[in-house]
Amino acid sequence: GGIKMKIVVGCDEAAYKLKETLKKYLEDKGNEIVDVGVYNENPSLYPETADKLCKEITNGNYERGILLCGTGIGMAITANKVPGIRAAVAHDIFSLERMIKSNNCQVLCMGARIIAPQSAELLLDTWLDIKYHDGPSTPKVNRIMEVENHYRCMR
């Protein structure tokens, strides 16, 4: 299921195996994937990967991104520092749906120490199908961007 999408993926060493599994899963479904690393299980600085991935989205190359680390939390914190990016951790179907329908998040963060690969694949099936549409949440998402712009201008 799901329309074909351009997706950028990234991880730290803790989630390298999960990233490889999910990358293949998404490619097998006909999605276009770019991998910003890491490419092995050597120690890495996950914020560098998050930064790289978010740039691919903010510059318009990719619609959505998936960031994987031990819990997804560090990746989400870092991604949300990038102006224009909305990222969330989701390991359940309701959060996954709301992160897009309510918050128009472009970046899904998951933890390799939290979720089994098979469960992550099932979540991705839903994630690919869900779209953001203007509606009751639009003023809220707009307000998020206003808050972001306020602090960006203060620097």
Please report, for each region that a protein language model flagged, where it lies by residue.
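C-terminal binding/interaction regions
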Residues: V8-G10, A14-A15, I93-R155
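Helix-adjacent hinge/juxtasegments
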Residues: K52-A90
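Structural motif
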Residues: N42-D51
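Short, Lys/Arg-enriched N-terminal segments with co-localized hydrophobic residues
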Residues: G1-K4
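Alpha-helical segments flanking ligand/cofactor-binding loops in enzyme cores
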Residues: D51, K55, I77, E97-I100, ...
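A short beta-strand-loop structural module common to alpha/beta enzyme folds
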Residues: E32-P43
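Glycine-rich phosphate/diphosphate-binding loop of Rossmann-like nucleotide-binding domains
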Residues: V9-E27
